Structure formats: C-alpha cells, structure tokens
Curated annotation (Swiss-Prot):
Residues 18-25 are annotated as: G1. Pfam families: GTP_EFTU, GTP_EFTU_D2, GTP_EFTU_D3. GO terms for molecular function: GTP binding; GTPase activity; guanosine tetraphosphate binding; translation elongation factor activity. Residues 82-85 are annotated as: G3. GTP hydrolase that promotes the GTP-dependent binding of aminoacyl-tRNA to the A-site of ribosomes during protein biosynthesis. Keywords: Cytoplasm, Elongation factor, GTP-binding, Hydrolase, Magnesium, Metal-binding, Nucleotide-binding, Protein biosynthesis. It is found in: Cytoplasm. Its main location: cytoplasm. Residues 9-204 form the tr-type G domain. Residues 137-140 are annotated as: G4. Mg(2+) binds at residue 25. Belongs to the TRAFAC class translation factor GTPase superfamily. Classic translation factor GTPase family. EF-Tu/EF-1A subfamily. This is Elongation factor Tu 2.
C-alpha cells in the first residue's frame, strides 16, 4: 500500500541538461542524498544505477528515457527530470525539457562547454524553457583558473541564446565528492538547491480548466491494471473521475482508479504534478505515448490545421535553405511526434529561414488538438521551426 503524498510545499518540475559524462546523473544522486538529510529521510536516496535504469543505458553509461527523481528543498517539493545527454536521444530531451519549469545546465569544470552543451541550450531556448541555472561540476578535478574561463564561456553561451547570461547563478559543485560524504561538497549541493529555490520562479498552475495530461509512458502493473504517466498540463483529476484517451487512434472512455506521485498515493492530481494514473479496463496495448488523457468532451483529435510558424535561421540552428510546397517534416506536440505535409498559403512558392508564415498542415495521424497548441518542427535531427495552431480544419 502506497503512503499518502504530503502537499505542504509547492511542487516544481526541473530538469538537468548538458554534455554526456559531465555528471548530470551523479548530480541528481547527490541532490537526493542532501535532500534526504534535510528532510529527515522523507526523500529516498536514489543511487546512480536507479536513475540510469534502462539496461541499455547502464551498458553504455548514458541516460536514455527521461528519469524522474524526487527531492525536497527548504521551500519546495521537486520532480527532477534527468534529461538524456546522448545525441541520439535529443527527441526525449525535447519532451522532457518542454515540460519543466526550469533547468540546471551541468558543465564539467574539466572540459568546459562542449558541442552538446551548446545544442542543449539552443533546444532549451527553442522549446521555451523559462529559466536556467548553472552547475559547474567536477571542481575537485579542475584547475581554479580554468573555472573562471569556463564561467565566462557559459555566460556568453546563455546570452547568445537570449537567457540572462550576466545574472544567471553559477554554482560550483563536486557531485561525486558529495555522494562520497564530503561535507564541503554537500554544502555546494545545498547552495545549488537554495539557488534553485530563489532563482526559478514558482509557476502559476492552471487548475480551473478541464483536466488534460499528455501521456509520456505506459506500464502494466500485475493485479492492478494499466498505468499511464505524465505531467498534468491543466486541471485536476480525482480517483473515480471519468476520462477519455484521445489521439492517434479511436477515442476511448475509462475511469481513473488511482493517482500516484513518486510511489505515494494522491487523492487528486493537479496541474504541474508528475503522476501515474491507473485506468480501469484498459489493456497495455490500448494506449500509447503521445495520446492525451482528458476530461470527456473537452478535446478532440484532428489531422488538418492552419498554423502561424516561425522558421529558424541558420544561425539559430535551423535550415540553410528554403522549403517548398508539400514539404514533410515531423511535428512535435506535447509528447508525440507525427509527420505532416505542409501546404503554403496565399500563393507563396517557398518559405525562407527567418520567415514568419501561415501554413496549412496535414498530419499522417490525428492528435489531440486545440487552438493555440504549440509545436516544434523538426527534420533530420534538428529543430527547423516553431509554431502555434491558429485554426483547426478537420
């Protein structure tokens, strides 16, 4: 039987980003250790292997699926998403990062800014992450003079992508020493936690709108049924509520029979919570990532829409050349990515990098959609544009 979840502190979702092997997962472990001590054991210490949990990850020592870790600071309760650092798994980072309230950029004090450091900051900008804080890790192995240069380089990088590089807090840590019990290193982790409390604003949660949760993952729990996980985008869900599963296939109705967060039971889940929702009478194969769970009748699946789109320039990491009628990139919406064909409107022959354009899009599969839905457009492993649904056609 799961224990009840204590909601006496506001909940906030943050993530770690940064180059592979710069210590993102070790930092997550160190934070759980310090938080467990701070909270009198209310937070479970997660060791590296528990966070880096998929078998192929452990073999390669690389985080693939975004892992969620819980911690409590002096002011808030957090879900920490350990965003993947390997270039093949950028797709997961997009869905992980786009659902966070802020990010910790982890940079090794030995290596400094690396190609993926740049790529992740660019992605954070593209998916609209509101704030970033910096952790310079591995300071026990680094040259102090080099650390000053790395700080300058990180500030320049953040400024380049429109984050406030001059004022962003940069905290120096040694996650590994903190894990091994070094008291000074633990103070560095505590300083990082305090900075997150103070610098990342508590987001306003949309509680008064109809319930909606994009599905990130699906599990089958023996004897209990099917659980879908994700971050609640808006509204509230209570045990016993009727919900619909919308998008990608025919809409299905079911009942929520349980809500859990970090293996603790909730009487209700609300906007901003990372939860698992138990569904009555739904088989594991009846539901998939990319669908949404929603209050019945509040959202419908669509394939065709018009959108206002901004196409990234080459300097922003986008295309070097224009695209034409019938261009077929991928559209990333919430937790799904679907191929769509673009029709250019008002007699346009092409769309150039840097253009703002109104386009008509026809997706190969229907997704849960309402007016104003944001999406990223990607092709060949890079983001080439961003847009919003302005009109639903069918």
């Amino acid at each position: 039987m799961a224990v009840a979840f204590n909601r006496d502190k506001p909940h906030c979702n943050i993530g770690t980003i940064g180059h592979v092997d710069h210590g993102k997962t070790s930092l997550a472990t160190a934070i759980t250790i310090v938080s467990s001590e701070l909270s009198g054991g209310a937070v479970k210490v997660k060791n590296y292997d528990e966070i880096d949990s998929a078998p192929e990850e452990r073999a390669r020592g690389i985080t693939i699926q975004t892992a969620h870790v819980e911690f409590i600071s002096k002011k808030r309760h957090y879900a920490l998403v350990d965003c993947p650092g390997h270039v093949d798994y950028i797709k997961n980072m997009i869905t992980g990062a786009s659902q966070t309230d802020g990010l910790i950029l982890v940079v090794s004090g030995v290596d400094g800014v690396m190609p993926q450091t740049r790529e992740h900051v660019l992605l954070a900008k593209q998916v609209g992450v509101p704030s970033i804080i910096v952790c310079i890790n591995k300071i026990d192995q680094a040259d102090p003079e080099l650390l000053e240069l790395i700080e300058m380089e990180v500030r320049e990088l953040l400024t380049k992508y429109d984050f406030p590089g001059d004022t962003v807090p940069i905290i120096r840590c040694s996650a590994l020493k903190a894990i091994n019990g070094d008291s000074d290193a633990k103070k560095g982790i505590l300083e990082l936690m305090d900075s997150i409390d103070d610098y990342i604003p508590q987001p306003t949660r949309v509680l008064d709108q109809p319930f909606l949760m994009p599905i990130e993952d699906v599990f089958s729990i023996l004897g209990r049924g099917t659980v879908v996980t994700g971050r609640i985008e808006r509204g509230v869900i209570k045990v016993g509520d009727e919900v619909e599963i919308v998008g990608l296939r025919s809409t299905q109705k079911t009942i929520c029979t349980g809500v859990e967060m970090f293996k603790k039971e909730l009487d209700q889940g609300q906007a901003g919570d990372n939860v698992g929702i138990l569904l009555r009478g739904i088989k594991r194969e009846d539901v998939e990532r990319g669908q949404v769970l929603a209050k019945p009748g509040t959202i419908t699946p669509h394939c065709s829409f018009e959108a206002e789109v901004y196409v990234l320039t080459k300097e922003e990491g986008g295309r070097h050349t224009p695209f034409f009628q019938n261009y077929r990139p991928q559209f990333y919406c919430r937790t799904t990515d679907v191929t769509g064909e673009i029709a250019l409107l008002s007699g346009k022959e092409m769309v150039m990098p840097g253009d703002h354009a109104t386009l008509s899009v026809n997706l190969v599969a229907p997704i849960a959609m309402d007016q104003g839905l944001s999406f990223a457009i990607r092709e060949g492993g890079k983001t080439i544009g961003a847009g919003k649904v302005s009109k639903i056609i069918k």
